[in-house]
Amino acid sequence: MSENGSFVGQPNFVIIFADDLGYGDLGVYGHPTIRTPHLDRMAAEGLRFTQFYTGASVCTPSRAALLTGRLPVRSGMADDRIRVIFPPSKGGLPAAEITIAEALKSIGYATAAIGKWHLGHLPEYLPTAHGFDEYFGIPYSNDMTPSASKGARVQTYPPLPLMRGEEIIEEEPDQRLLTRRYTEESITFIRSNVDNPFFLYVPHSMPHIPIFASEDFEGTSTRGLYGDVIEELDWSVGQILEVLRDTGLDRKTFVIFTSDNSPWLTVGLAGGTAGLLRNGKGTTWEGGMRVPTIAWWPETIPAGNVTQALGKTMNLLPTMLGLAGAALPGDRVLDGVDLTPVLKDPAARVRESVYYYRGAQLWAARKGPWKMHYITRSAYVGDQPVMHIPPALYHLDRDPGERFNVAADEPEVLREIQAMVDAHKEELVKAPSQLDIPEWND
């Protein structure tokens, strides 16, 4: 960063990635009872986004989008039938994809992934095959284990593995301790790389169901166990930021906190809230793909600001590579753009468009404040899709809850968005699915 930013050199990068965290689950985003003092402070010292999007509304494609800067359909990490990787899956993030970790490692960064991976659990797809020097965590979701469900299919899964590098070091780890163990591993990595530029990716397992909190947090929130879980995540963020302060790395480290998608609404009190946004996980409504996001970099990102600029997890690859002085891949389409102008000035704007995919199909698109829906569903699973002919249209600045369809009043806006979508589809090349499980024919 230069000019308006004070740090010059190769910064460190930390991505803290919650799992199924709702847009309305943090104190700084308006939750009335969940206490998040560390995230609140992070926002007060940094930049809070009100319109930040993930690349998909479920786990696997969202993670692929974040690490590659590309829509998941371009890498084969999106599928209409099997929407995430399961223990029987044979695929994963292709070796040809370039991750943030690979690009930064190529210019001397130390790299670590600590937490839930969910981009392929066979050796050729693990973090160590995608640019990470170190890995500690579980390779897929914490509910994909016989101990979490009595379902017949789940009972065929192996015990949940906890891995270090490419080795399983435990089976069925105590999930009450996952957040704490990820935090401790993260702190160790940071302290081991005080003199090296580093990239730390911390994809937490929580608050994906089944939810667990450690003894120190269980029963401490008035929101119940879900609140306990979020307050422990907040503690974890505080621990990571504190070690950066203690080591003097805070002024040379760009930290971003966000989520893979918004809340799983059908699991009752075990899930969160999307606040004023409509619906949640698994859908292309705002409540599924707009996520709480805070950027922090003392003395470089101006403190205490809120931006309405559109941001995306896919922006992180070009942003971080640009800040580190690494070349962007020139042999492929990137869907993310550099967010540095917004980090410097919350009034700045970068690419103001969003494509909302469900699986490998485009269900909605946003241009500026306008969002057009072709198809909608009201839940992750269990309901039927609704076709919109003509497409439904919402003005998200005036109607962020997507309650008032104004398509009949805005035919020209529909035409403009359709032209944008047509151009997108014309250039898009979808890769073969990595997620399909042929033996699952039911």
Task: Please provide the spans of the model-predicted regions.
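Formylglycine-dependent sulfatase
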Residues: 1-392, 400-442
